[in-house]
UniProtKB/Swiss-Prot annotation:
Protein's UniProt name: NADH-quinone oxidoreductase subunit C 2
Top EC category: translocase
Lineage, opening ranks: Bacteria, Pseudomonadati, Pseudomonadota, Alphaproteobacteria, Hyphomicrobiales
Subunit details: NDH-1 is composed of 14 different subunits. Subunits NuoB, C, D, E, F, and G constitute the peripheral sector of the complex.
Similarity section: Belongs to the complex I 30 kDa subunit family.
Length: 182
């Protein structure tokens, strides 16, 4: 995807003008930044446009950019089975992080969005069943956030949680690695 701009990229930029920011391409995957309020419309356009047909939602990832602002981001990876094209959509979110659900565009978004909710606390507005998928109901916090305690929170299931100093770590920069032996 070098040289002349591909037809599908021209269609994307032409249809959304200044609302969609072209982030360029890496490894043949074009990336776009889309405001949260336009994510559903943009995704539906990518799926339904006859020249594009991004019919496969590979995944949705949550990203925590702490301490940057905006802190959170959702990243959508799409694939067109017909055209064999990939595209990445990035959506920066304020706090508390929330974005409309794309389950009305791709049903598989259901599980991907539940995972981003469970790990990062990103709320997908309009999701049909937004509940934890890995952690148990009643779990406090979101374990993939950068401010989540590395040892977890202290509770009955984790009596050695956040209180107390962290375990000592070897200093890899000085090769101060403890030597095991027999």
């Amino acid at each position: 995807m070098t040289g002349e701009r591909p037809v599908h990229l021209t269609a994307i930029i032409g249809s959304f003008g200044g609302a969609v920011e072209n982030l360029g391409a890496a490894h043949g995957i074009y990336a776009f930044a889309v405001p949260p309020e336009q994510i559903v419309e943009f995704c539906r356009f990518l799926k339904e446009h006859p020249a594009l047909e991004f019919d496969f939602l590979s995944d949705i990832c949550g990203v925590d950019h702490y301490p940057e602002t905006p802190r959170f981001e959702t990243v959508y990876h799409l694939y067109s089975l017909k055209n064999k094209w990939r595209v990445r959509i990035k959506c920066r979110l304020g706090e508390p992080p929330h974005v409309p659900t794309v389950t009305g565009v791709w049903r598989t978004a259901n599980w991907h969005e539940r995972e981003a909710w469970d790990m990062y606390g990103i709320r997908f507005e309009g999701h049909p069943d937004l509940r934890r998928i890995y952690m148990w109901e009643g779990f406090e916090g979101f374990p993939q956030r950068k401010d989540f305690p590395l040892r977890g929170y202290k509770d009955k299931l984790n009596p050695f949680g956040a209180e107390g100093p962290p375990p000592t770590q070897p200093d890899l920069a000085t090769n101060d690695i403890p030597q095991g032996g027999r």
